From Swiss-Prot:
ATP binds at residues 26-33, 145-148, 174, 182-185. (R)-pantoate binds at residues 57, 151. Its EC number is 6.3.2.1. This is Pantothenate synthetase. The lineage of its organism: Bacteria, Pseudomonadati, Pseudomonadota, Betaproteobacteria, Burkholderiales. It comes from Bordetella pertussis (strain Tohama I / ATCC BAA-589 / NCTC 13251). GO terms for biological process: pantothenate biosynthetic process.
Amino acid sequence: MKVVHTIQDLRDHLRGQNRVAFVPTMGNLHEGHLALMKLARQHGDPVVTSIFVNRLQFGPNEDFDRYPRTLPDDVAKMERDRDVYLVFAPDEREMYPEPQNYRVLPPDDLGDILEGEFRPGFFTGVCTVVMKLLACVQPRVAVFGKKDYQQLMVVRNMCRQLQLPVEILAHETVRADDGLALSSRNRYLSEAERAEAPVLYETLRGIAQRRAGGEQDPAALERVAAQALADRGWKVDYVAVRRQRDLKAPDVAEMSAGEPLVALAAAKLGATRLIDNLEF
């Protein structure tokens, strides 16, 4: 496995390759990331991973400065699993050698809802860096996790509408034994918070169970779930029941007709903001 830090070195190593599979990350890798790399290896060769903490997708009061930078540990994990051929680990100057005045803006009806409402500009930052990384790597396939459900949809729609020659593959959310979705930010949790954290996923499962039990009002499903979290001390940003196909709210007819849905939630446990989702 090789590690490169410049776009030129990246392109030199990939010259002539036309089956590249790509996994973009911000580093601080866990088993969820490594699962994406295993899926990438099934769909392309060589596998390229990027490690870059992208300032553009962090808001002014978010955790850009304290986000863990763990490149040596990340490299060791990838070397252990032997799924990755090339790691692209640029610094900020390499990715943004001048002010990034040209940016990729997702449509308001997808980019400004849910995560976009509570993290203004987040998806513009995501789309811009993903577009740049795809231009650098030029993969045939790229793999994203379903844990970031809205991000997956934004990126997939961007690539389709801009006719980028890349297939976006999705990997199911990887979870700990108690159901907590693996996340680089889980390390911020105290011992007591870590014990409480699986409740977020349990709450989403409760939404699916109530719908299966006959509840057809999405607002009622959202309200009960959000209140249950708040009663346990969570600070809830949103609990939303949406259509899987476009993240729009379902109407009553769609609820009764069995429309495929997804429940999405974001809430703070102490100082740590967690997100999760469940298709049903």
